[in-house]
Swiss-Prot record:
It comes from Rattus norvegicus. Keywords: Cell membrane, Endoplasmic reticulum, Membrane, Repeat, Transmembrane, Transmembrane helix. Residues 1-608 are cytoplasmic. MORN repeats lie at residues 17-39, 41-62, 63-84, 85-107, 108-130, 131-153, 284-306, 307-329. The gene is Jph4. This is Junctophilin-4. Pfam families: MORN. GO terms for biological process: learning; neuromuscular process controlling balance; regulation of cytokine production; regulation of store-operated calcium entry; regulation of synaptic plasticity. Residues 160-216, 233-278, 420-604 are annotated as: Disordered. Residues 233-243, 455-469, 530-543 have a biased composition (Low complexity).
């Protein structure tokens, strides 16, 4: 297997990165572990950030999918001990569409926002019941439809404060129950009931659970009646007569369609309990607030029991109408699931007028409930469509998760291949803040994280660091890389050499000698292995040997003709970059190139041919003069 360019970093907090490396950042396949092997990301990296891979947390939970800028973004699958989410991710949180499933059978498919159900969605409960409608911040809120399963299949509710199966993955801790009020036994109509069944008739368990203690048994109501009898000193009626009159008023209210009696009229006569058939189902359509039936809505049971009107906290509360299976009705104002009539009657208005006002309010409530049903049915259709889209996203996320697992496998294989080659970390010089002195810097210092910190277990990141003031040398675009066998950088022009390497005196003469040798066809020393001395360049960041901190071999030195001492031409510098920079950990080969200084042109050495010609001309002139004289 071809092993690509890679790096290994051991962090101070115990984390470690082994994998691909490019341009000073993690790139390609790599594995990063947290402190003490608490959490691991393995997969693909792109310019210092995770792109596609698998993150495994210390508790065993995992995420498989896409990443962007160090956060979960795109499609992915998250698995924990008791639930799984498959779908889209946005900014590291669940959203916008996905499917959440629990080992108990609870499932939600729909829209998400900031990690919670928000928008339209369908929730299927462990017993098979469903809710389709609107959501807000992880709770049922808006318009929706709750459909139960047959009564004998419905899940038995454990908590009397919750009357339907809620989203166990999004519910906050349940606050303590409020103190019971006089006349309220402290239980909701679904206390001990089954999921989806909240409608209570006169003979249901709710009617039986709302019985008060009779005056004969003593208690609050007996004391209140005694005190009221003492206060009403002008009336010469006995306690027994009061008790009898109260019973007569309550007995006349049961089964009536008008508003007789008052709220404080005493305990109702318990009706014989009527068992719910095992095949009975119940459906509620209407408004929801904070995960409970609140507002206008209609609840109907398959045996004919029906309520239309106002709701509050999963109870009939406000004005509404109840229709019994036998066709009889009761209507009026409800409070905590019981029919009341606004306190003791003190006015002298005719009974028909008072009934007419209550009837008008009931009709308005029924009309509002029916409008709410229509709106809830529309939201139900939208929620079903969004759930179908979420299922498609879940399938796509599962496919991406498979690719992420394969990328993680490749990353671990490459890390295993790189591990033996990167066992011995090198040491490189690092300039301090003053830029004058150097100190050894271990190769295993962090090069991809800021301040030597590894990412948290939730989301491992390789953030982009600010650019370092010591940047690695890069070849100009016009130059081509060296062929195999050469690893030297280009030499600077003689005019650019600093003053301390030679001035216009002795060093200038030596330079003139070099130029004379070139004109005469003499060849200077070339680089080893037959590679050209000038024009080529090699990026030291592409060499594993240099990254591991091996020493550079010395370059050959040029000598002046006839001279015994060599003069330095140029020296490669291993530049150690700041560990806080994005290119930290890269050993780069740089050459000192100070500003060029212009030198006066020096006359070249005398040409032997010219000297010979001049000498011959002198001899010829001398011969001619001698002939003339003779």
């Amino acid at each position: 297997m071809h092993v690509p360019l890679g790096r290994k970093f051991d962090f101070d907090d115990g984390g470690c990165y082994v994998g691909g490396w490019e341009a000073g950042r993690a790139h390609g396949y790599g594995v990063c572990t947290g402190p003490g092997a608490q959490g691991e990301y393995s997969g693909c990296w792109a310019h210092g950030f995770e792109s596609l891979g698998v993150f495994t947390g210390p508790g065993g939970h995992s995420y498989q999918g896409h990443w962007q800028q160090g956060k979960r973004e795109g499609l992915g699958v998250e698995r924990k001990s008791r639930w799984t989410y498959r779908g889209e991710w946005l900014g590291g949180l669940k959203g916008r569409s996905g499917v959440w499933e629990s080992v108990s059978g609870l499932r939600y498919a729909g829209l998400w926002k900031d990690g919670f159900q928000d928008g339209y969605g369908t929730e299927t409960y462990s017993d098979g019941g469903t809710y389709q409608g609107q959501w807000q911040a992880g709770k049922r809120h808006g318009y929706g439809v709750r459909q139960s399963v047959p009564y004998h299949q419905a899940a038995l509710l454990r908590s009397p404060r919750r009357t339907s199966l809620d989203s166990g993955h999004s519910d906050p801790p349940t606050p303590p129950p409020p103190l019971p009020l006089p006349g309220d036994e402290g239980g909701s109509p679904a206390s001990g009931s089954r999921g989806g069944f909240v409608l209570a008739g006169p003979g249901d368990a709710d009617g039986a659970s709302s019985r008060k203690r009779t005056p004969a048994a003593g208690g609050f109501f007996r004391r209140s009646l005694l005190l009221s009898g003492l206060r009403a000193g002008g009336r010469r009626s006995s306690l027994g007569s009061k008790r009898g009159s109260l019973r007569s008023e309550v007995s006349s209210e049961v089964g009536s369609t008008g508003p007789p009696g008052s709220e404080a009229s005493g305990p109702p006569i318990p009706a014989p309990p009527a068992l719910i058939e095992g095949s009975a189902t119940e459906v509620y359509a209407g408004e929801w607030r904070a995960d409970r039936r609140s507002g206008y809505g209609v609840s109907q049971r398959s045996n004919g029991l029906r309520y239309e009107g106002e709701w509050l906290g999963n109870r009939r509360h406000g004005y509404g109408r109840t229709t019994r299976p036998d066709g009889s009705r009761e209507e009026g104002k409800y409070k905590r699931n019981r029919l009341v009539h606004g306190g003791r009657v003190r006015s002298l208005l005719p009974l028909a007028l008072r009934r007419g006002k209550v009837k008008e309010k009931v009709d308005r409530a029924v009309e509002g409930a029916r409008r709410a049903v229509s709106a809830a049915r529309q939201r139900q259709e939208i929620a079903a469509a969004r759930a179908a889209d979420a299922l498609l996203k879940a399938v796509a996320a599962s496919s991406v998760a498979e690719k992420a697992v394969e990328a993680a496998r490749m990353a671990k294989l490459i890390a295993q291949d790189l591990q033996p080659m990167l066992e011995a970390p090198g040491r490189r010089p690092r300039q301090d803040s003053g830029g004058s002195d150097t100190e050894p810097l271990d190769e295993d210092s962090p090069g991809v994280y800021e301040n030597g910190l590894t990412p948290s277990e939730g989301s491992p990141e390789l953030p982009s660091s600010p650019a370092s003031s010591h940047q690695p040398w890069r070849a100009p675009p016009c130059r081509s890389p060296l062929p195999p066998g050469g690893n030297w950088g280009p030499f600077s022009s003689p005019k650019a050499w600093p003053e301390e390497w030679g001035g216009p005196g002795e060093q200038a003469e030596e330079l003139a000698g070099y130029e004379a040798e070139d004109e005469a066809g003499m060849q200077g020393p070339g680089p080893r292995d037959g590679s050209p001395l000038l024009g080529g360049c090699s990026d030291s960041s592409g060499s594993l040997r240099e990254e591991e901190g091996e020493d550079e071999e010395s370059l050959p030195q040029l000598r002046a003709p006839g001279g015994s001492e060599s003069e330095p031409v140029t020296t490669p510098v291993l530049r150690g970059l700041s560990s806080r920079g994005p290119d930290a950990g890269c050993l780069t080969e740089e050459f000192e190139e100070p500003a060029a200084t212009e030198r006066p042109a020096q006359p070249g050495a005398a040409n032997p041919l010219v000297v010979g010609a001049v000498a011959l001309l002198d001899l010829s002139l001398a011969f001619l003069f001698s002939q003339l004289l003779t």
